[in-house]
Amino acid sequence: MSTRESFNPETYELDKSFRLTRFTELKGTGCKVPQDVLQKLLESLQENHFQEDEQFLGAVMPRLGIGMDTCVIPLRHGGLSLVQTTDYIYPIVDDPYMMGRIACANVLSDLYAMGVTECDNMLMLLGVSNKMTDRERDKVIPLIIQGFKDAAEEAGTSVTGGQTVLNPWIVLGGVATTVCQPNEFIMPDNAVPGDVLVLTKPLGTQVAVAVHQWLDIPEKWNKIKLVVTQEDVELAYQEAMMNMARLNRTAAGLMHTFNAHAATDITGFGILGHAQNLAKQQRNEVSFVIHNLPVLAKMAAVSKACGNMFGLMHGTCPETSGGLLICLPREQAARFCAEIKSPKYGEGHQAWIIGIVEKGNRTARIIDKPRIIEVAPQVATQNVNPTPGATS
């Protein structure tokens, strides 16, 4: 796992007390409207959805719309589909460049959950806090934009426009669009009994970034210092930051290689919320049962010490730019997990078999006492700092 030197505001002629996360009251994808409320709010959009297009396309082409993270819209010509997603988050780490990378990875992740590996175009949506000084704005916002741009280039796409507005809180997001043939994406509705559930990033990012901020808040740090050291927190924070900035593109490609039946990415509703949403979309009468929870090292202990206030053990803790939850044939899952670790994909990363697909009523649950898999930090050094003079 690559590491990055801690962001030093003074390097950019900012006050040493500058913290990007102070320009929002919510963190990351913890900004999401609760799932049950969202479904009610979207009911009016779902009425007569796609009715106009039926006269052109009938039901021959697969389509997705309201209620899922990505839309799949058949185009009127050429047997192609538009696959598109939009997302935005609030700052979750204090490093502006890495926050830009995380925001971009978070937008692209919904395409990757469809097995799409190529993005044709990105737009960036940026809310600049009106509480920033001119100096803070002029130093920090270019770093965020550079991080977003670099992540887009890593994904093989480019940012061609967007929208920038003033806002009380910093808002970071975008739109990702591609045009695909039917064999270039995987519909998220084909899970069958006997499949297994695979997760491609560990849980606990929200816990890691929260407790990292607690290092500066003695009354909160005192609650957890018996179960975790400052070094543990720093390592978990680094691991969380690099994981959030990592694209799910490799996993998306391997979904095709190993015949994935369905997938979603894990973000603001936590692993259980997203598993439940995916289960509801299945054509077959199945349910998902989660037995294992891979968690960043020491973050499970921190969560327990806090009385499970994060909801980590219950699967409701929000994640930001989390991994893919993939339904794979049982005989393919171990090979998927081995392949994604291969050095041919850069550093190689872990994936875990965390549960099963069984006959059921399109629900998802975590067993009463899931096995917690402590995911140790993978520490290596690699300079991912942009050149200060290039973006300030």
Curated annotation (Swiss-Prot):
Matching InterPro entries: PurM-like_C_dom, PurM-like_C_sf, PurM-like_N, PurM-like_N_sf, SPS/SelD
Entry's Gene Ontology cellular component terms: nuclear membrane; plasma membrane
Gene Ontology MF annotations: ATP binding; metal ion binding; protein heterodimerization activity; protein homodimerization activity; selenide, water dikinase activity
Reactions that this protein is recorded to catalyse: hydrogenselenide + ATP + H2O = selenophosphate + AMP + phosphate + 2 H(+)
Binding site for ATP: 32, 67-69, 87, 110, 161-164
Cofactor(s) essential for the protein: Mg(2+)
Localization per Swiss-Prot or TrEMBL: Cell membrane; Nucleus membrane
Residues that bind Mg(2+): 69, 110, 265
Main localization category: membrane
EC number: 2.7.9.3
Record-marked site positions (Important for catalytic activity): 32
Alphabetized Pfam families for the sequence: AIRS, AIRS_C
UniProt KW keywords: Acetylation, ATP-binding, Cell membrane, Kinase, Magnesium, Membrane, Metal-binding, Nucleotide-binding, Nucleus, Selenium, Transferase
PTM sites of type N-acetylserine: 2
Cofactor, how bound (note): Binds 1 Mg(2+) ion per monomer.
SUPFAM superfamilies named among the record's database cross-references: PurM C-terminal domain-like, PurM N-terminal domain-like
Active site residues of this protein: 31
Leading EC class: transferase
Membrane topology note: Peripheral membrane protein
Membrane-crossing segments per the record: none
Function statement: Synthesizes selenophosphate from selenide and ATP.
Family membership: Belongs to the selenophosphate synthase 1 family. Class II subfamily.
Subunit record text: Homodimer.
Name of the protein this chain belongs to: Selenide, water dikinase 1
Organism: Mus musculus
